Amino acid sequence: MDADSKRFLATLRSRSEMLMGFEEIDGDDDFQEEFACPFCAESYDIIGLCCHIDDEHTLESKNAVCPVCSLKVGVDIVAHITLHHGSLFKLQRKRKSRKSGTNSTLSLLRKELREGDLQRLLGFTSRNGSVASSVTPDPLLSSFISPTRSQSSPAPRQTKNVSEDKQIERKRQVFISPVSLKDREERRHKSEFVQRLLSSAIFDEV
């Protein structure tokens, strides 16, 4: 392999690597500038044109008219386009990336819309805090939720019963203590009366 063929292969390799760096993202643009191939008159965007010339017109790529600036070029046409019109690669790449950003935004909006519809169908709270009014709670789901509440409800009743028992006991004590005092009073009076009777009977006998 001679030096010219090696140089030619190295040029092809570096050119293909550079074109891969500016590789476009799939999808059509609203406006995309196209250029006619100087050898077969087919139209391509700037990246497609360079790839087409590299693939189809490698041997005849010298001494052609540049489709961008319409000047006759004495060197390799692809090398001329990449060196003198490199801004077109960047511009096309920006357009593609901008379109891909728009597509991703649209897909996100569609996803949010789908999730919002799903939340409304299931009766969950929406993002602005409102609840779907048309959805009624499922009785089957509520029956699964309610047992936990009913199991925890007897505890307050038990505490209530204990407090009521204590209050009743206190009332009993209050009622019992006056009765016992009265009994004691009556017993004391009776004993005094009996003592008087006995003393009077004794004194009468004397």
Curated annotation (Swiss-Prot):
Tissue specificity as recorded in UniProt: Expressed in seedlings, roots, leaves, stems, flowers and siliques.
Post-translational modification: Phosphorylated within the NLS/NES region.
The record's note on its domains: The NLS/NES region (98-121) is necessary and sufficient for interaction with CPK11.
Protein's gene: DI19-1
Induction / repression: By drought stress, but not by abscisic acid.
Organism lineage string: Eukaryota, Viridiplantae, Streptophyta, Embryophyta, Tracheophyta
Pfam families from the UniProt entry: Di19_C, zf-Di19
Keyword line: Nucleus, Phosphoprotein
Protein name, per record: Protein DEHYDRATION-INDUCED 19
Range of residues in the leader sequence: none
Region (Disordered): 142-167
Chain coiled-coil ranges: none
Family per similarity comment: Belongs to the Di19 family.
Start-end of Polar residues biased regions: 143-161
Main localization, broad class: nucleus
Compartments reported by the entry: Nucleus
Chain positions with Phosphothreonine modification: 105
Residues that bear Phosphoserine: 107
